[in-house]
Regions:
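Alpha-helical cap/lid subdomain in secreted, periplasmic
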Residues: 68-252
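Residue-level marker of positions within ordered structural domains that often coincide
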Residues: 10, 43, 88
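N-terminal regions of proteins, emphasizing targeting and processing segments when present
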Residues: 13-14, 121
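Sec-dependent N-terminal signal peptides
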Residues: 3-12
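Short, solvent-exposed polar/charged micro-motifs at secondary-structure junctions
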Residues: 58-62, 173-176
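Serine-esterase "nucleophile elbow" of acetyl-processing enzymes
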Residues: 15-60, 67-79, 83
Length: 252
C-alpha cells in the first residue's frame, strides 16, 4: 500500500454508525470519479456520502457554498465521521475562477479544510490527487506531482492521515500500460486512441459533438464504472490501512 500513515487510534462509540464523507472534484464525484466504486465497498452499516463536485478546486468548492453543506453535516455525529479531502486537478493554472497559487493558496486552503474538520470534532483525511492516464513513449506523464507533494506537507504539518493516491495510482497505471488504462474512461476509447495506445502514446482527443451534453465522453482524466471500481478499491485499501477503526467497514 502507498498510504502514508500518520495513524491515530480512534475508537468508535458503542453502537455508533461511522460516516465517511468524500470532498473533492470530478475524479472523486458521482458519474465521473472513483467515489461510487469506493462507496460500493463500504458496508451497509456505515454511511458513505459523496459530496465531491466536478470542476471544483480548493477555492471554488468553498466559494460556491459546497463546504458549508459539509460543515452542516458535521453538526451531528462528527466524532464518528471521517472527511476525505482531495483536490489538485482544478487548482492547476489556466482555470479561471478555480486556479490557486501552488506555493500559497493551495496549501493554505487545505490547511483550513483540515483545521475546520478537526474543530467540528470530526476526522480529516487528506488524499493526493488521482493521476491522469496520459502516456508518452510508454511512460505515464506526471502532471500532478507538485500538488500531491503540497498535500503531503500539509498532512505532515497538521498530523492528519494522508492517502497517497497519486503515487499508488501512477504506479498501477504505469504497470497496466496505455492500452489497458484507456479502458478505465467514461466512454470506450475511439480508434485513434486504440492505435496510439498500442504504441505507448495517448493522442489528443477532441470532444465529439452530441445532442446530449451529459453523454459520457472519452478522456484521460475521468472514470467509467471499471475505473471507478478499480480506484475506489485502491482508496478503500489505503483508508483501511491508515484508519484502523474503519477496517471492519471496508471489506476487501
Amino acid at each position: 500500500m502507498k498510504a502514508l500513515l500518520l495513524t491515530f487510534v480512534v475508537s468508535l462509540a458503542a453502537g455508533a454508525q461511522p460516516r465517511i464523507i468524500l470532498v473533492g472534484d470530478s475524479t472523486m464525484a458521482v458519474k465521473s470519479g472513483y467515489g461510487p466504486g469506493f462507496c460500493a465497498i463500504v458496508r451497509s452499516d456505515a454511511i458513505c456520502l459523496n459530496m465531491a463536485k466536478g470542476g471544483r478546486s480548493t477555492s471554488s468548492y468553498r466559494a460556491e457554498g459546497s463546504w458549508d453543506q459539509v460543515m452542516e453535516k458535521l453538526k451531528t455525529g462528527a466524532s464518528d465521521t471521517w472527511v476525505l479531502i482531495q483536490f489538485g486537478h482544478n487548482d492547476q493554472p489556466g482555470k479561471p475562477g478555480r486556479s490557486t497559487d501552488l506555493a500559497t493558496e493551495f496549501p493554505d486552503n487545505l490547511r483550513r479544510y483540515v483545521e475546520e474538520v478537526k474543530s467540528a470534532g470530526a476526522h480529516p483525511v487528506l488524499v493526493t490527487p488521482l493521476t491522469r492516464r496520459s502516456f508518452r513513449n510508454g511512460q505515464l506523464q506526471d502532471t500532478l506531482g507538485p500538488w500531491a507533494d503540497a498535500a503531503k506537507k500539509v498532512a505532515a504539518e497538521l498530523g492528519a492521515p494522508l492517502l497517497d493516491l497519486h503515487a499508488e495510482s501512477m504506479a498501477a497505471v504505469q504497470k497496466m500500460g496505455a492500452v489497458e488504462a484507456s479502458t478505465l474512461a467514461m466512454a470506450p476509447p475511439p480508434a485513434v486512441v486504440i492505435e496510439g495506445a498500442a504504441a505507448g502514446n495517448s493522442p489528443n482527443v477532441l470532444k465529439p459533438e452530441t445532442a446530449d451534453p451529459n453523454a459520457p465522453v472519452f478522456d484521460y482524466t475521468h472514470l467509467g464504472a471499471k475505473g471507478s471500481a478499480f480506484f475506489g478499491r485502491m482508496v478503500a485499501s489505503e483508508l483501511a490501512e491508515a484508519v484502523p477503526a474503519l477496517q471492519p467497514y471496508l471489506p476487501l
